[in-house]
Amino acid sequence: MSTIAASAKIHPTAVVEDGAVIGENVVIGALAYVGPKVTLHDDVRLHNHAVVSGLTVIGRGSVVHPMAVIGGTPQAVRHDGSETTLEIGERCIMREGVTMNAGSSDGGGKTIVGDDNLFLANSHVAHDCRLGRHIILSNNVMLAGHVTIEDRAILGGGCAVHQFTRIGRQAFIGGLSAVNYDVIPYGMLNGNPGILGGLNVVGMTRSGIERADIHKVRRVYKAIFEAEGTIRGNAAAIDRNDYLDCPQALEIIDFIGAGSDRAISSPNRGK
């Protein structure tokens, strides 16, 4: 049987399958569907015609708008059909037509979305993605499988992100861009193919990063992308001791040094 809190409000035309767990003050609108292995935490709201299926957990206060399909099976040809999961954090907003898939059998089996994220109409989160907090996916953004996006990144409308790509903290991706390679924290990328266009100085300033730290990040950026040599080699050559008081600079150095299946986006389409 389903576990449905007494304070939940479920429209008589909605379908809540036996086994679903429905928290306090959840609202489920007309013709919405909730699968038998779904958990909706307190204060979640499903608008009319929203679909939540699979082994999906949606955190407190999140909102799913009409025609969104959350928790569908992964669009991965190698998936063996086993049951995998989708975990969505608190206070996320999924607008009309958003799709999010569960993980795949060969990718860890989990798609994980953090708290306080905004997914605008028709954006897509594929299998095995890992998303942090306070991220914005604008209309029609497409994330392929295994993408990682760090906190406070913003992706403009219609951009597409290649599988296994990483997008760093507070990066800004321009609309209609093709993100083929990793994007450093605080980077700005535009175009198809995507070209690194410098640092997201406006975003850094708005988030309260001191001007002195922004200058240090610029110095690191120049040392990595404007000097002779490879991106990873240049990053490895930087003396971390010079930036111990600037976590943003160290974050860029560590992001590049962490290694990845993808190259690093640069002003020259990758070195």
Swiss-Prot record:
The keyword Lipid metabolism applies. One of its GO terms (biological process) is lipid A biosynthetic process. Keywords: Acyltransferase, Cytoplasm, Lipid A biosynthesis, Lipid biosynthesis, Lipid metabolism, Repeat, Transferase. It is found in: Cytoplasm. SUPFAM superfamilies: Trimeric LpxA-like enzymes. It holds the Pfam family Hexapep. One of its GO terms (cellular component) is membrane. GO terms for molecular function: acyl-[acyl-carrier-protein]-UDP-N-acetylglucosamine O-acyltransferase activity. The keyword Lipid metabolism applies. Its EC number is 2.3.1.129. InterPro entries: Acetyltransf_C (IPR029098), Acetyltransf_C_sf (IPR037157), Hexapep (IPR001451), Hexapep_transf_CS (IPR018357), Lipid_A_LpxA (IPR010137), Trimer_LpxA-like_sf (IPR011004). Coiled coil: none annotated. Pathway: Glycolipid biosynthesis; lipid IV(A) biosynthesis; lipid IV(A) from (3R)-3-hydroxytetradecanoyl-[acyl-carrier-protein] and UDP-N-acetyl-alpha-D-glucosamine: step 1/6. It catalyses: a (3R)-hydroxyacyl-[ACP] + UDP-N-acetyl-alpha-D-glucosamine = a UDP-3-O-[(3R)-3-hydroxyacyl]-N-acetyl-alpha-D-glucosamine + holo-[ACP]. It comes from the Bacteria. Gene3D superfamilies: Hexapeptide repeat proteins, Udp N-acetylglucosamine O-acyltransferase, C-terminal domain. Its main location: cytoplasm. NCBIfam families: lipid_A_lpxA (TIGR01852), PRK05289.1 (NF003657). Belongs to the transferase hexapeptide repeat family. LpxA subfamily. Homotrimer. Involved in the biosynthesis of lipid A, a phosphorylated glycolipid that anchors the lipopolysaccharide to the outer membrane of the cell. This is Acyl-[acyl-carrier-protein]--UDP-N-acetylglucosamine O-acyltransferase.
